[in-house]
Amino acid sequence: MTTLETLKWDGKKVGKVSIDLKVAKETSSSDLIHRAVLRQLANQRQGTASTLTRSEVRGGGRKPYKQKGTGRARQGSIRTPLRPGGGVIFGPKPRSYNLDMNRKERRLALRTALMSRVDDIKAVEDFGSTLNQPKTSEIINGLSRLGIEKTEKVLVILDSPSEVIKKSINNIAKVKLIAADQLNVFDILNANKLVIGQSAINKIQEVYAS
């Protein structure tokens, strides 16, 4: 179990909150997280790249010139891979890059990744409570009050983010918003700081406890 200090949106300390998630053994955690990240990135690949082989390129049925007497290298088709516009040798074809990983391992990898970042977590009781309408500057100022630099990549995790908060964060290049029940290993590891709403911590423990 880990205890985190809870901050208000104005940056003041108001209490503590505990988070207790089962993690992988130290001997296997690196490999588990590595496989989870590889799977996530591989599954994002479209795999739609496609080239034409010499049998698929249009034309080339006639021999371009006679076999002998020209002094040139012999050619049987204008669609040979040796000529411009010809087929491609061993070029890419549509394929699936998807990697498998069972649900139990995926959940364990996510919990392990999250708990490995406890030193970078800012637990906030009332994230964006002063926002009545979308305002990017208020989010930037709020993150600054929490001790986060403008140059740092931030992952904001909230239980049920409002449209006002979504629109306010949308224009900030280094800040990403994600719902507590849609976490992924890559985003957790890619951010410099994690800002988690207090209700989101409860949601995380409810959803990812097992």
From Swiss-Prot:
Any one GO CC term of the record: ribonucleoprotein complex
UniProt keyword Ribonucleoprotein present: yes
Alphabetical list of Gene3D superfamilies matching this protein: 3.40.1370.10
InterPro entries: Ribosomal_uL4 (IPR002136), Ribosomal_uL4-like (IPR013005), Ribosomal_uL4_dom_sf (IPR023574)
Ribonucleoprotein is among the record's keywords: yes
Organism superkingdom: Bacteria
A Pfam family annotated for this UniProt entry: Ribosomal_L4
Biased composition (Polar residues): 44-54
GO biological process: translation
Molecular function in Gene Ontology: rRNA binding; structural constituent of ribosome
HAMAP family in UniProt: Ribosomal_uL4_B (MF_01328_B)
Self-association and partners: Part of the 50S ribosomal subunit.
General function of this protein: One of the primary rRNA binding proteins, this protein initially binds near the 5'-end of the 23S rRNA. It is important during the early stages of 50S assembly. It makes multiple contacts with different domains of the 23S rRNA in the assembled 50S subunit and ribosome.
Record-stated family: Belongs to the universal ribosomal protein uL4 family.
Protein name, as recorded: Large ribosomal subunit protein uL4
